[in-house]
Structures are given as structure tokens and as C-alpha cells.
């Protein structure tokens, strides 16, 4: 993006750059967790490359500590770029503004999603002080709310993905077709016995237990199938509930905060 600033209008250059930096950090961090040693095993262990250019170049493998440092550097730079993010400034955005590009910030790596990801990375690193600071900033923003029970009780228009809790989510227009292969109650589906489901949630008052599972039919009536990603057919079903696959959510910030306080 460097040298192409004149191609963008308004705040778009810095906001898009911030999102791109954050996405690079997100993807690299997940790759590290899969293919690299954890920070608790050894910060000096050789892990994987951190790719910073779109080029036919072989990048050197990084030590775990150096790799995590580069993840955090990208996230810090991203947060700086996103200082004018509407989710942070409170600026109202409509379709009139650049065709609404900066609307629906929860399906972009917005400022608070970056802070949430920083909390995740700092916790992984063992830097509990900074993890707590970042988690508290997200929680204290007031931009994300716990799902309300009244938005779950009507099965035809329920907020099954708990969308108000999303810091960052993907909008996958084919999500229904994907999950129906595995969660539709057929022979090849993933399912839980009712007894096991009760063990997991322990209380019939847990919203996940009450509203996110459906009962199998016929010979499968003892099984419970996840319906969190079901795509409902009602025309009244809110657009903000559709096709959402959450990647960073509000509850994680509370878990991080709790672990930091414990440490």
C-alpha cells in the first residue's frame, strides 16, 4: 500500500492498512500455534518464517520469541492505523459514505478486534500485565454486549451466533451449505448424547444448553445437534445474524482477564 495513498479517500488508507496488518498477524499467529513450539516450551526454539512481502522469496525461520515480537509489532502498528476507526470514534457511517465500506465493523479486523487479538497473543507469551490491559480496554469499550435472552427464544428469528458478542467474525455466504453436511442430523453428522450435553453445561439455565442444540428425529431422538450455524429461512431474520462465523468474541476477553488476575 505504500506509495499508493492517493488511491484512497477519507480514512480508508489507514483503516485498510490497519486491517491488513492485523490480518497478517492473525494468520501468522495461528500458524505458529500449529507448527511452532509454545512460548512456555522455549522462546529460543526455531519456529516458522514471518512473511512480510508478497514476493518469491524464501524467508528465514524465526525463533519463537522473535516471531511473537513480529506479531505484536504488526498489531501495534495496526492499532495505530485504526485510531480513526468508526467503532472507536463513534462516527456514524451510512451507505452514502463510500458505499458503506466502513459499516459493519464487526466483520472487519476493527480497532477493538486488534486489541482483543493482542490480549490473546500477550497471554500466549506469558505477558499477563499487557494481556489484562488489552482485555480490559475491549470490555470497557461498551461496544460489545452479551446476547439477550429475548433474542434467542423465538426459534425462527433467533440470534444463534450470539452476534452482539463478536469482536471479529467472518461473513460466509455459503455457511449454511457447509454446516448442513455435518450438523443436519444425518448419519454423518456430529452429535452429542443428551447426558453428555448436560455434563458439559451443567445447568439448564445456560443459554448455550437451552438454545443452541436441536433434538434428533426418529432413532436419533437421544442425540443433540448443534444449530449455532444454522441459517434460518424467515425473511424477518436479521441480516446481522446471518452467515456469521466468529473468530474473536467478548467471552474470551473475560477468560483472559480472569487468567491474568489469577496469575
Name what the model sees in each region.
Residues 240, 261-263:
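C-terminal soluble interaction/assembly domains
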Amino acid at each position: 500500500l505504500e506509495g499508493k495513498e492517493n488511491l484512497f479517500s477519507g480514512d480508508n488508507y489507514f483503516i485498510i492498512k490497519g486491517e491488513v496488518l492485523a490480518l497478517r498477524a492473525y494468520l501468522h499467529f495461528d500458524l505458529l500455534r500449529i507448527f511452532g513450539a509454545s512460548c512456555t516450551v522455549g522462546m529460543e526454539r526455531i519456529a516458522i518464517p514471518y512473511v512480510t512481502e508478497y514476493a518469491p522469496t524464501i524467508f528465514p525461520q524465526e525463533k519463537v520469541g522473535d516471531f511473537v515480537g513480529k506479531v505484536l509489532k504488526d498489531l501495534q502498528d495496526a492499532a495505530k492505523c485504526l485510531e480513526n476507526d468508526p467503532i472507536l470514534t463513534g462516527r456514524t457511517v451510512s451507505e452514502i459514505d463510500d458505499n458503506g465500506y466502513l459499516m459493519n465493523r464487526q466483520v472487519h479486523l476493527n480497532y477493538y478486534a486488534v486489541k482483543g487479538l493482542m490480549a490473546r497473543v500477550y497471554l500466549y507469551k506469558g505477558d499477563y500485565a499487557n494481556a489484562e490491559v488489552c482485555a480490559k480496554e475491549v470490555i470497557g469499550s461498551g461496544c460489545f454486549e452479551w446476547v439477550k435472552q429475548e433474542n434467542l427464544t423465538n426459534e425462527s428469528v433467533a440470534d444463534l451466533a450470539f452476534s452482539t458478542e463478536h469482536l471479529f467474525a467472518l461473513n460466509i455466504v455459503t455457511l449454511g451449505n457447509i454446516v448442513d453436511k455435518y450438523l443436519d442430523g444425518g448419519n454423518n453428522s456430529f452429535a452429542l448424547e443428551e447426558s453428555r450435553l448436560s455434563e458439559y453445561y451443567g445447568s439448564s439455565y445456560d443459554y448455550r444448553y437451552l438454545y443452541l442444540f436441536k433434538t434428533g428425529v426418529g432413532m436419533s431422538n437421544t442425540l443433540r445437534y448443534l444449530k449455532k450455524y444454522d441459517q434460518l429461512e424467515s425473511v424477518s431474520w436479521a441480516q446481522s445474524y446471518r452467515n456469521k462465523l466468529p473468530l474473536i468474541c467478548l467471552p474470551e476477553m473475560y477468560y483472559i482477564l480472569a487468567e491474568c488476575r489469577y496469575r
